[in-house]
């Protein structure tokens, strides 16, 4: 008679239990006794420590780390920024050597030099910043670099290039120049370069952070397929809960130590432990708990379909249990509250007045004023405003590598808005914002510009209009140096904007560079102090430190301080929260709202995070194919999830739940912010209000 399988924990235990059922007691017992061969360890750390320099215990990036990953296992690594995740990844690949302890990769001792080539041949790693691993000037050459170095035959390399490009949706860019691609496109190429190696172990270090939702899904689908079908071992470092849920096991790191391991669904619902380790509950779980506090009996779930099902059952049960007067009509989604009594937030009220206003008011021309005075007067009336008409741009124009990035952009951003820009990878978002402070200049603004002579019968090109903060960017007479002091730009990976020896010198650089006269040292100190304190950094503690010694989050704050120190009227941020842990994202968005209130009239963020857009922006523009195809409040944009999905975009989590419920006949009318969603569901159910934390 067959006995019950023994108690074994973890991924190895799950697989051995399955083998016990298939092979029987005798074979399973032999496997358990041997502890090897049948299920090999792809990665094994034994009491590993690592320090980037100091000998003190606090300086260690990894401390006494022991864990193993079985061949074919999919493991997600979670943790706040600076917890040691990236260090761990680099130790696996042999890019770093441990201070002490032992690391084995595919049964090979990583400390032995003779094993280095074999390990690196079988371990592929994709970094967060694709610029750090781009080596060639043509995409296909970049992807071929790895296979060439491990001796793959030419014909096979060609097939692998095609496979990898197709897997990441970049086949049409095979002969393009990587430096001319968008950040998200570069990231796809970096992932393709590793896929072409067909490694036994694949490590992705926040490598989907810069991708649009469709790109993230395409990459994770490929990785999941390779894991399931080819048994490739995957180590996925991520901040996205939906990615972590794909894994067999999740590891949580804090201050260089592994502090939790288990099933992702279990790990992501442990509120007390997550807060202890500077992490936050995923947004779906927080919504569940807020609704449960209101009296709806729902379980913690992590997907919109699961939450929709939970809500449908809970609302139906409540509808049957209470009188009709207590329960809202499914047609209006409100519990007896007229629409006019539901207040809009300050942002949304401002947004309502801005929507539909495409052109700024134009004052009557003062014929007595000089041309310069007229420009200055108009600028004063348009401070913080952006008006764009017929804007187009081609990279590598006139060459075989020509690529149309913008194609007739039409957009007005009103002064005072907190504005969002969304769009799939390569849609023209970054190219557009680089026009706003003339990093990319319009041809008519170049000093050597001469109008093209038209041939007989040839139509003139469309008139381009681009005014930013009152400056005419089509006019070569515009003071572009002054413009750049008024339009601050924070790029993707803002920490790479740092260059000076000290934090003080870095933050003060723009202030000194843009001033027409040498500013007084006391004024510079005062301005730098104010900028650093605004971004949450202590002036006395930071001023003499090297910016390159700071943590990732501190570097990002110093970079933002260096931009706002000139007190720009417009602040533009390209993916400001990309690569940050959930707590870091929340803090950076709170910081931007503080800057919007105290420093800058208009704030513009480019983002792939639809929840970030819905929670923070008064209005947003959707870019596709180099054009703006929609501009509206997020609450209106996300009413058409199918259209956005077709563009490679996502919608907020709450919009997905709302759509699911609508399909079941329950209409919840909210602005898709988590707080408002909780309120509207509570109103629908006739539940007394409480505090929503989401």
Where are these regions (language model features)?
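The feature captures the beta-strand-to-loop junction immediately N-terminal to the Walker
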Residues: 78-80, 422-424
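Conserved ABC transporter NBD signature motif
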Residues: 101-111, 119, 445-475, 483, ...
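Helix-to-loop junction immediately C-terminal to a conserved catalytic motif
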Residues: 93, 437
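Conserved catalytic motifs of ABC-family nucleotide-binding domains
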Residues: 198, 567
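Conserved ABC ATPase signature
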Residues: 177-181, 185, 546-550, 554
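Catalytic Walker B motif of ABC-type/P-loop ATPase nucleotide-binding domains
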Residues: 202-205, 571-574
């Amino acid at each position: 008679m067959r006995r019950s399988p023994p108690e074994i924990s973890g991924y190895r235990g799950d697989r051995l239990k399955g083998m016990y059922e298939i092979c029987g007691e005798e074979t399973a017992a032999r496997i358990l006794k041997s502890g090897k061969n049948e299920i090999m360890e792809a990665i094994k750390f034994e009491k590993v420590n690592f320090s980037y320099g100091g000998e003190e215990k606090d300086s260690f990036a990894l401390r006494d780390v022991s864990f193993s990953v079985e061949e074919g296992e999919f493991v997600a690594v979670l943790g706040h920024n600076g917890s040691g995740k990236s260090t761990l990844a680099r130790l696996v690949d042999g890019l770093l050597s441990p201070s002490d302890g032992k690391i084995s990769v595919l049964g090979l001792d990583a400390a032995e030099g003779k094993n280095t080539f074999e390990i690196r041949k079988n371990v592929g790693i994709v970094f967060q910043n694709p610029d750090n691993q781009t080596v060639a000037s043509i995409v296909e050459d970049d992807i071929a670099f790895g296979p060439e170095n491990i001796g793959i035959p030419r014909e096979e390399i060609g097939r692998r290039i095609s496979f990898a490009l197709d897997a990441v949706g970049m086949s049409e860019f095979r002969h393009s120049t990587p430096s001319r691609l968008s950040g998200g496109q570069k990231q796809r190429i970096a992932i393709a370069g590793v896929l072409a190696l067909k490694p036994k172990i694949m490590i992705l270090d926040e490598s989907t952070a810069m991708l649009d939702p469709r790109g993230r899904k395409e990459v994770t689908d490929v990785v999941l397929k390779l894991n399931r079908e080819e048994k490739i071992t995957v180590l996925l470092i991520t901040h996205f809960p939906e990615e972590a849920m794909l894994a067999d096991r999740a590891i949580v790191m804090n201050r260089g130590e592994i502090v939790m391991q288990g099933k992702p669904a279990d790990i992501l619902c442990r509120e007390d432990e997550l807060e202890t380790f500077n992490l936050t509950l995923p947004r779906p779980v927080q919504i569940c708990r807020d609704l449960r506090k209101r009296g709806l009996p729902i379980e913690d779930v992590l997907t919109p379909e699961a939450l929709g099902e939970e809500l449908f059952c809970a609302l139906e049960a409540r509808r049957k249990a209470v009188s009709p007067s207590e329960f809202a009509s499914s047609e209006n989604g409100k519990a007896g509250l007229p629409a006019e009594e539901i207040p809009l937030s300050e942002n949304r009220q401002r947004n309502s007045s801005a929507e539909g206003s495409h052109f700024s008011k134009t004052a009557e021309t003062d014929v007595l004023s000089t041309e310069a005075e007229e420009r200055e007067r108009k600028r004063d009336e348009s401070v913080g405003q952006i008006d764009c008409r017929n804007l187009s741009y081609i990279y590598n124009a006139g060459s075989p590598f020509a690529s149309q990035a913008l194609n007739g952009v039409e957009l007005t951003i009103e002064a005072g808005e907190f504005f969002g820009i969304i769009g799939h990878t390569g849609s023209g978002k970054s190219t557009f914002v680089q026009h706003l402070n003339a990093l990319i200049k319009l041809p008519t603004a170049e000093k050597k510009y001469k109008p093209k002579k038209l041939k007989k019968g040839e139509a003139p090109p469309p008139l381009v209009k681009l005014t930013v903060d009152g400056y005419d960017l089509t006019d070569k007479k515009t003071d572009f140096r002054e413009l750049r002091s008024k339009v601050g730009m924070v790029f993707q990976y803002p920490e790479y904007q740092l260059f000076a020896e000290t934090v003080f010198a870095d933050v003060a650089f723009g202030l000194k560079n843009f001033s027409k006269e040498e500013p007084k040292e006391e004024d510079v100190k005062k301005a730098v102090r104010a900028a650093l304190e605004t971004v949450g950094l202590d002036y006395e503690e930071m001023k003499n430190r090297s910016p390159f010694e700071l943590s990732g989050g501190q570097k990002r704050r110093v970079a933002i301080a260096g931009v706002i120190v000139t007190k720009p009227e417009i602040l533009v941020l390209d993916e400001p929260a990309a690569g940050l842990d959930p707590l870091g994202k929340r803090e950076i968005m709170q910081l931007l709202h503080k800057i919007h209130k105290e420093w800058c009239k208009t704030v513009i963020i480019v983002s792939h995070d639809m929840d970030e857009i819905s929670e923070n922006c008064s209005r947003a523009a959707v870019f596709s194919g180099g054009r703006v195809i929609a501009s509206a409040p997020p609450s209106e944009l996300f009413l058409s999830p199918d259209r956005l999905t077709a563009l490679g975009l996502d919608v907020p989590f709450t919009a997905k739940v709302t759509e699911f419920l609508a399909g079941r006949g329950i209409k919840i009318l909210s602005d898709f912010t988590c707080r408002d969603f909780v309120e509207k569901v509570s109103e629908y159910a006739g539940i007394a209000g409480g505090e929503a934390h989401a």
